[in-house]
Amino acid sequence: MKIRFEEMRSPEIGEFIKKDGMVIVPIGACEVHGRHLPVITDTKMAYSAAIDAAEKMSGKIPVSVLPAVWFGYSISILKNWPGTITIRPKVLIDLLYNICQSLIDMGIDKILIVNGHGNNPGVLDVVVRSIGDDFKVFPGVANIFDCWDKGYVMQNRRSKPGGIGHACEIETSVLLHLSEDLVDMSVADSTDIMKSDLQTCPVDWGTSKKRKLYLSTWYLENSTYGGAGDPSCATKEFGKAIHNMTVNGLCEVIEEFYRTQQNLKGRKLNRKCQKF
């Protein structure tokens, strides 16, 4: 069975559906990532991890990966630099809703959205809940950054506090592993290292502090090049470790999600308000 959905012919997709196949919808963004990374960074990270996880799980579960949704919701401050293409949340919700509906209409009821962009989760939560309300099919969302082990990151990072955020040590390291030719390390410096130190809303991802407050931290910083962190100490080895961690985490998600969806099949769900 082919992993890439777009490479299958219609009869092959029909056979995939008969096998109770699961579809992954990768999504990222097209936005500035400093001077040193390509604008497709988030999408590339999500799609590469989804493909590798699907290939790893293909012997256990029939799974196929859609072409990536390469744009997402980006806050307006990122339009200060060339390269950012942002989609209004309501438009992005409708787009993903239609993708899920199309899959459901052809008989696919196991849909996992794999996200690589930090501004997308709120939008994606609305999509999967709306699909559940309207079709009684329950897609899932897996954010690649939720697959990362903070303990490992804290122990192995080379950047100082404030160095892991956007176009940072982690993202630069992963891109060095995936597509080194797209990275320009000659301009990867610490100019945009984050300086805010909030206790309830940590700006650095690689910290033991727990987030108790959501705040758009971009407006706390004064980015020069459209980054937030320190990419200068990125390494291909660290990137490979993070990518493999993401793939393994997604494999766990795929296995449990598929099993959970099978258990939901045939379950009767109340559509009426319960009387007490």
Question: What are the residue ranges of the model-derived segments?
Answer:
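Extended, histidine- and acidic-residue-enriched regions that form the cofactor-binding/catalytic faces
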Residues: 1-110, 116-276
